[in-house]
Amino acid sequence: MSAAIAEARAQGLVGERFDGYLAIVGDAGDQLRHQVQAINIRRRALYSDLADRRGASLEQVGMTAACQLLPTVHVGERYQASDKVWRTRSAGQELLVPDYCR
């Protein structure tokens, strides 16, 4: 992950989604949007390859990846659970992960 994306995550401008992709949270410049799009294109290509090899759907692979990506969200960073509500991770607060991650 680039330093710009890491900084944007720390500022709450970019967050991890429940489906394995990054998203812009609120207002962001074009450069940041392009970086998020590029990461999501790479993730989608990886998920597609894994889905083909495993005989799974793209969505299933993305959701499985989310189960690994969501725990990487640090305190102060944003994430979206399967209810599609954006949350900010707080110190001492349990991360709300989708049921399929348990």
Model-derived features: where do they sit?
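Amphipathic, charged alpha-helical segments and their helix-to-coil junctions
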Residues: 1-11, 15-16, 23-25, 58-102
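Surface-exposed, polar/charged faces of alpha-helical domains
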Residues: 27-34, 38-41, 45, 49-56, ...
